[in-house]
Amino acid sequence: HEEAGEALTQKAQQLVAHAKAHKSKIIVPAFALGRTQDLVMRIKRLVAEGRIDPLPIYIDSPLASKVTDVFRKHPECYDEETFRTFTSEGDPFAARYIRYVSSPEESKRLNEMKGPCVIIASSGMCEGGRVVHHLKHGIQDEANIIAIVGFQAEHTLGRRLVEGWDVVPIFGIPTPRRAQVVVFNGLSAHADRNDLLAYVRAISPAPQQVFVVHGEEKQALSLGAAIQTEHPGMAVVVPAKDSIYEI
């Protein structure tokens, strides 16, 4: 379910208070493109409004750093609110408490560092990247928090964390999970079921054929059935893996 903005803020406040009280780490698996930049801007806004105290934040993703540089170079692509922030307050992705980590050596030092701090690293589903190393070193500390801020596909480490597994495979080694897992719903950048149904309704002229892709099988089949029910004359296809269609 989606969480309202105030509920998300209260949850963030609780996490920051916990990290400060326990001198612990908040580990955030995040996609390098879009999600990391969105999180940085959300955190900056909450700090500026006095809603949360600033903690040291480490963006530990070389790709996220490069993508952020692209964002910085093209303010003409921002929405109105972000553009106002950029022109009035300067770089929307920088603050005295935010550091972008580049070298592997600096990334490794984060594992030896005491909290409180926030580590935002990719990959978003914990299937690779530097976040897996941070999980390896931090997941067995019950004072630490793993904050899930995006969709986690089936059979990924991220999904297992969301499902509350007590032991998870990290680099192929069964590893006890003692850190708390906190899920933030409502941050998805994808359209939901109702949005997708509305999108199909709005297409004019109506398509003769619709392919439901980029989703888990159960949900894709359910969405396909819903589209078919609304549009009986439409050919709705949920492609099987490795199938080929000529359009």
Language-model regions: role of each:
Residues 1-247:
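Acidic/His-rich, metal-assisted hydrolase cores and their charged scaffolds
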